[in-house]
Amino acid sequence: MHNVNTTTTGLSLAKILASTELGDNTIQAGNDAANKLFSLTIADLTANKNINTTNAHSTSNILIPELKAPKSLNASSQLTLLIGNLIQILGEKSLTALTNKITAWKSQQQARQQKNLEFSDKINTLLSETEGLTRDYEKQINKLKNADSKIKDLENKINQIQTRLSELDPDSPEKKKLSREEIQLTIKKDAAVKDRTLIEQKTLSIHSKLTDKSMQLEKEIDSFSAFSNTASAEQLSTQQKSLTGLASVTQLMATFIQLVGKNNEESLKNDLALFQSLQESRKTEMERKSDEYAAEVRKAEELNRVMGCVGKILGALLTIVSVVAAAFSGGASLALADVGLALMVTDAIVQAATGNSFMEQALNPIMKAVIEPLIKLLSDAFTKMLEGLGVDSKKAKMIGSILGAIAGALVLVAAVVLVATVGKQAAAKLAENIGKIIGKTLTDLIPKFLKNFSSQLDDLITNAVARLNKFLGAAGDEVISKQIISTHLNQAVLLGESVNSATQAGGSVASAVFQNSASTNLADLTLSKYQVEQLSKYISEAIEKFGQLQEVIADLLASMSNSQANRTDVAKAILQQTTA
């Protein structure tokens, strides 16, 4: 059983009830004390009831309960009644305080309204007076204008009469008449001047009154504005002070939502601007790499096409030489390919054993004095001709070198025939003169040769074979000479095939270089494409993050709205209980 200290509690309650001025803090403290006492009393009553119930059950078989008259309230019951009365009194005090606050607020509003009405009446009165004075002032201004006009007309008439009088004879009757008119007009002018003076004085008086009223009106308007601003500031301050804890939390939540939304939007804008800048830079880089890749692929294709043409030209020339060799050998050169290969092997063995190549010694004078300068001369001529046709300088130089080498190969074939026919010494003696003659002749004939080569190729081969057969028939034994020429021509074919293979290999290497550069650019382009895809992914993530933050903001708004709705419901319930 709880022991309630009613003495201490009673003293506190007595002090509270004896107080004539109960503020909000006092009422709250009283409510807390009353609730505590009520809880303790209920617990005490519950304990007593449990004890009585236990005793009744234990003696149910022995004692029969008897009816007794109701007892008066014991100490606990009296305390409960006291607490109930206290709660009622505190509630009434709270309602009284609220009513007093509302009454004070209404009185304040009525005072402000009365003050506003006073300002309004004063302003309206001053405004009406100002408008009346303004109308009077306008009338006086018009009168002044009319008076000035009248005086001016009289002065003009007097001036005209005076001018006329100066022209007339002094004894003339008309002059006497005009003199009388002048006197009358002068009298009227003096009267008009006096009237204007009176009008001007009245106008100045009205002007002074109008100025005073205008200043009073402006002063009242300024006072009213200051009063309205002060009242608004006081009302706003009162509203801010009246905010409860829940309203303050709601206000803080709204401020937080505003800051989060603004920060989220600015962050998204910054991210999008950064990603867009990066995308633009990567786009420019990809376009540059794409152009470089296309250029390298184009170079490789052009080189493959050129080297294919060179291979076809060399193949055709080697076919021509093979046909010439077949003409000398009666077709036997086709079966003697192994013999040509054996000669090359023999030349390699002799060179390894003695250090000298008999084929190199035989062709050395012609190569140094004729072939090498001739190739250079022809290459330069082909290059200049191609540049004149509008071909790029670098490409023209490369193609000119190839065509010069081909022409040199043709001369080399002729040199092989020459060595086989007239011998090493004669070839050495004739090399220099032949080189000059052939160089000059071929330089002059290059354009015509390129233009007419395809149409005159058959005739050229036929005439060359006929002349060479005739020359060889006059020089020695026909069969032996033809076999020797055929052998050397076959060697020339093998050499030409080697040159062709080397040329094709060089072209393949150059093409591979271009293709390697193209592959590098393609790899960079692929990397840039991947980076752009990553940037797009980052943009999507930024937008998704923005959406998530917006969802958080929406949840906060919903929580704030629910809190405000609960607060409104509580306020409605309190208002209903108050009005009831």
UniProtKB/Swiss-Prot annotation:
Keyword Transmembrane appears in the UniProt entry: yes
Keywords: Host membrane, Membrane, Plasmid, Secreted, Transmembrane, Transmembrane helix, Virulence
Residues annotated as transmembrane: 313-333, 399-419
Cellular localisation: Secreted; Host membrane
Source species, domain of life: Bacteria
Membrane topology term: Multi-pass membrane protein
Disulfide topology: none
UniProt GO cellular component terms: extracellular region; host cell membrane; membrane
Main location per the UniProt record: secreted
InterPro entries: BipB-like_C, IpaB/BipB/SctE_N, T3SS_SctE/BipB
Record's keyword annotation contains Membrane: yes
Similarity section: Belongs to the SctE/SipB/YopB family.
Its job: Component of the type III secretion system (T3SS), also called injectisome, which is used to inject bacterial effector proteins into eukaryotic host cells. IpaB/SctE and IpaC/SctB are inserted into the host membrane where they form a pore and allow the translocation of effector proteins into the cytosol of target cells.
Subunit and partners: The core secretion machinery of the T3SS is composed of approximately 20 different proteins, including cytoplasmic components, a base, an export apparatus and a needle. This subunit is involved in the formation of a pore, called the translocon, in host membrane.
Name this polypeptide is given: Type 3 secretion system translocon protein SctE
Protein's gene: sctE
